[in-house]
């Protein structure tokens, strides 16, 4: 699905980048990981590190503060101060990706040699 994601990103004047925190293994902890193991391709959309009006360092500080103080804690709740504009953009990207996949003549599949090319159960 990399080509689909890259095409959508180009059409939306965005760029695709590698996972900035691969050591966290978020794909392997995701809800769609069992599908990948069964041979069903999936993607993970995540926030980037280009924040409108803020530096990369600001974004990293926000991530670290939330992750250390609130992630999977009783305080892990929505806040009125959150800015959802980026989430709207992610939804638009996901919709465009879904549309492109639905127009494909064949179902998506993993490329030979990909980690999940051979389904496991």
Q: Where would I find each of the regions flagged by the language model?
A:
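Secretory-pathway/membrane protein signature
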Residues: 1-121
């Amino acid at each position: 699905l990399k080509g689909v994601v890259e095409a959508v990103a180009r059409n939306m004047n965005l760029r695709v980048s590698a996972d900035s925190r691969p050591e966290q293994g978020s794909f392997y902890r995701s809800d769609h990981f069992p599908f990948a193991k069964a041979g069903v391709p999936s993607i993970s959309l995540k926030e980037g590190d280009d924040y409108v009006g803020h530096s990369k360092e600001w974004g990293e500080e926000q991530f670290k503060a939330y992750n250390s103080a609130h992630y999977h804690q009783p305080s892990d709740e929505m806040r009125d101060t959150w800015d959802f504009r980026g989430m709207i953009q992610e939804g638009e990207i996901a919709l465009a990706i879904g549309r492109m996949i639905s127009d494909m003549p064949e179902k998506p599949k993993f490329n030979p040699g990909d980690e999940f090319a051979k389904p496991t159960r």
